[in-house]
Amino acid sequence: SAASFVANAIARGEISCGMAGGVESISLVQFNLNFNGFFYEPLQQMMPAVWWTMNQTADFVAERYQISRRDLDEYVVMSQKRVAEANAAGKYADEIVPFATKMKVTDKASGQSSMVDVTLDHDEGPRPDTTIEKLSALKPVLEGGTTTAGNASQLSDGAAAVVMMDAELAAKRGLPILGYWRGFALGSVAPEEMSIAITPAIRKLMKLNAVNAGD
C-alpha cells in the first residue's frame, strides 16, 4: 500500500521521488496484544473463522485445495535450497543494509535475560540444512493437520523500503532502473481461507494490465 501511495503521487505529478517502506514486528504482538474489544459476540456467532489462528486457516486451505503434507514439505525444501544458493552467490548483499540494535538474550540454563549489542546484516530465517526427512519427522501443530514448525511462516521482525522515482528523473541522474511500477490491486476472500487472498489480487492486477500467467 505504501508503494501504491508513492507511485500514485508520482503519476499525478505531486512528487518526482519518494520512499515507500513497511515494518512488521511480531515480537511486539506475541505478548502485548490489546484484547480490548477483540471479541464481538454477534459477529463471532455468524463468522467464527474471523478469530481463527493462522494454523487453522493454513490447515483449512490445505484441505480445501488438496495440498498434501508432502506437497508442503517439498515446496519448503525447494524454497530453502533457492535462498541458500542466492545467499551463497551474494544476491542479497546489496539489498540488506546492516544496522546496530539491541537484542534480548535469555540463558537457557539460568533463565536470566540480558540485552546485548548486535548488528543485523542478514536474514536469520533461512535453514540451509533443511531436508525432506527432517521435515517429515515434525509433528503437525494441530491434530490431523498439515502445518508444522518446518513448513509454516517463521515468527520474526522485518522491515523493507524502496526508492521510487519518475523514470525521466532517474535517467537524467543516471540511476539504474531496477523495475517499473505497473499497478496495484486488492483481493478479498472468506476469513477461513485468508492466506490465499493474494490470488484474486494477482488475477485482478493481471486483468488490469492485460497480461496472463504465461506472459
Predicted feature locations:
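A glycine/threonine-rich phosphate-anchoring loop and its flanking beta-alpha core
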Residues: 35-70
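Glycine/threonine-rich beta-strand-loop-alpha-helix active-site module
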Residues: 12-44
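Beta-strand segments within the central parallel beta-sheet cores of soluble alpha/beta enzyme folds
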Residues: 18-24, 71-78, 96-101, 175-186, ...
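Conserved catalytic cysteine-centered active-site region
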Residues: 1-15, 35-37, 49-56, 129-154
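Short acidic, glycine/serine/threonine-rich loops at helix termini
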Residues: 28-34, 110-111, 192-195
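N-terminal extracellular/periplasmic Venus flytrap/periplasmic-binding protein-like
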Residues: 71-172
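Active-site pocket-shaping loop/turn-to-helix segments
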Residues: 1-4, 43-52, 70-77, 147-160, ...
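Condensing-enzyme catalytic core of the thiolase-fold
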Residues: 85, 133, 161-183, 196-208
